[in-house]
């Protein structure tokens, strides 16, 4: 999923998927033709990129991609992995893997899912000239450096990774550069989904009308296409799917909303079946409104305040001091209580508290405490290097309930540091993310990361490793990279978690982004549906929702 997959209030990597989510579009059925009454109506948002698994790192697109494709592994609602397309995955050293596929899997165009479907897709995702946003997920594979533009002239020396070899139609081998503790776990992430041959003929066209092998497929109707941009996406069960996530409904309609208040009103009136993000205006009253029709709990979603290191005053030592000052100037606890009514928890590290291995008492995490005196002292030290002038502007997408908390953060910064700090709304998530991804945004911005698989490394490597696809601020620290590599090379998960936590000491010192809070998800539903559950990373368990 994303990548940073990341939602504003909720909704990752997959690969985050960045969890920068938004809800864009219009009202239920608006422009969507005749609504089939058996579709489960769920909220979503216009994907900012074509629906290609190796380049979908946002939560809007990620939730669709995960319905349309199936990988070697899949995750249940608790985040537990199990084999899906894979019949077996064998390794004796966490370096060399032999992967066998189950027979009789096929894409919705009728073509078979073969070893080449995986190997060709992974090579496409890794090749630098394809500029795929999830490229860094393939970095452990031997030969990645040669295809990713890692040669001296910055151009790929090869077009295929040497560590991938097709044995036959249903078997292939993978050789990694070094032991990678979470490689097996990441094989259910969207970056590793297979692609049919038709995709490579015209990837842009494929992204507009993807052909997958997952539990659902895009479903045109006599009155309109499955995907009406900025309106909705319809998916129906794939009759040829025989994996772990068999749908228990007759299809889903992802409705794109211009704001969460409208979505919440539709939920109450029965025009929406499931809403995965309660708007701030309804947080004090949703329990009264929904009765027993909601669920809540901590999920793997992290929110942060990001400032590109290339901006004036935010590079070098001056920038480090200013970011540390901003962290100390934000009253996280007050905002979590007053704006989010207890549905957020103040950050204690750079991952998420629901993940295995999370430690709320990391050395140095006092930099995440609200400390106005320290904030002013650090800002003054930065001014001694180069005097501050102008505004501190925080960009955000206005279609996902962000204004309240961005204004609160800006006011906290203004009151503590005595500078002019303001929020800057942008109308849609898609346009907002395009500026960030293209590195043309000229201000700070809100960000979020939704887990793609339950691993602390997955919250660290895509966002902070040098050159990673979701490293939107341009952070680079070779010492952090080395510490992260040590965590990935650990012989067991317990040691890996300890080393991942140790690697965060560099992040506490450098403060590449300002962690804000973790999600406590609240998902609400109408009386038309049942069996609604929230998954480990904050999304509804779509396949198991029952309507009628």
Enumerate the predicted regions with their spans:
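Structural transition elements
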Residues: 345-382, 399-404
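N-terminal lobe/hinge region of extracytoplasmic solute-binding protein
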Residues: 43-93, 123, 211
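Surface-exposed binding/hinge segments that line
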Residues: 90, 130-197
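Extracytoplasmic/peripheral linker and loop segments enriched in polar/acidic and small residues
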Residues: 165, 324, 336-337, 419-433, ...
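Alpha-helical secondary-structure segments
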Residues: 113-123, 169-175, 215, 249-251, ...
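Gly/Pro-rich hinge or "lid" segments in bacterial periplasmic/extracellular proteins
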Residues: 179-247, 251-253
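Extracellular/periplasmic solute-recognition and catalytic clefts
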Residues: 219-234, 253-313, 337
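Long beta-strand-rich cores associated with HINT superfamily self-processing modules
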Residues: 523-548
